[in-house]
Amino acid sequence: MNLYHNFLIGGLAAMMTMGNAMATEHNDLTGYREGAKVIQVKPSRNQIDAISGIVYSQIATARETRPLHMSLLIPRTEAPKPAIIYFPGGGFTSANHDKYIQMRMALAEAGFVVAAAEYRIVPDTFPAPVNDGKAAVRYLRQHAETYGVDPARIGVLGDSAGGWLVQMLGTTQGETAFDRGDFTDKSSDVQAVATIYGISDLLNIGEGYADNIQKVHQSPAVTEALLVHGPAFREFAGASIMDDTVKARHASPMGHLSNSKPPFLIMHGDKDSLVSPHQSAQLFDALRKAGEKVDYVVVKGAEHGDLTWYQPEVIQEVVSWFTRELKPDTGVLADQSARSNDNL
């Protein structure tokens, strides 16, 4: 009994001694009070600044001037960084550039300046979205120093209709007819293209689907027809995408495969019921046949725009690919003193 008693007293004394030692150690911390939790953190990631409401282009019409907006995520590092411009999907009827924040933030944390840009949609017709996409690239090059961008390393990322747009940016490099607006002395070329369940040929979006779905894509009211021909108005009764195949092919990435292309990452879900997986397969086949650098990822079980595309495995696939192609400098943290004034 005495042995147990002595052991208990000794243990309590040791704990009190240890506690007093820790309290003495923490008393050296400015602002410390007994009972406070103390942690120590080693910085391993950079601060990311967000800028919104940037007007990258102004479209003049007979009635008004329409601004097109861009937002930016900028890692606070010293060296110029590669940039990626995200163009959102929306079936050619919307272009909400606030989407896909998980992907955009992951890219910013990997060391990229990440822009997200809206573009003109139906009832505006082709080539308006392509003109806008190229204008966004030129704007970023023009303001590269302001935003810490390396103008020689600009990639583009898009999903669905945004995937069509970035494919067009990659396949029409050197076709200056699409360069309209400001800063036309700057190149609109891009150094990497990542397309997620994008459209490569407006003439066969429903390839492999049931006959009734393929017939829908021959309607004058379907969005690809509206993109190419515009809506019915006055004497114009509207037109099917099949009514002018030359025009439709000119508005498709598959119609611009003659020149050399930047590296492509193509991703598609095998269960996509909105944009046929054949759209990505045919682009992959064509680029590979032409000897271009292209990677193709089929995501098993993925539908069009479902939650699969927001999971870490998909996001990491995209981040890793852009990292290989554009090589951001992720090893240098910003000077802590340089940011102190912003935190006051």
Question: Where in the sequence are the language-model features?
Answer:
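Mobile cap/lid helix-loop segments that gate and shape the active-site cleft of serine hydrolases
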Residues: 43-46, 210-256, 262, 289
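Catalytic nucleophile-loop/oxyanion-hole region of alpha/beta-hydrolase
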Residues: 95-103, 115-151, 308-314
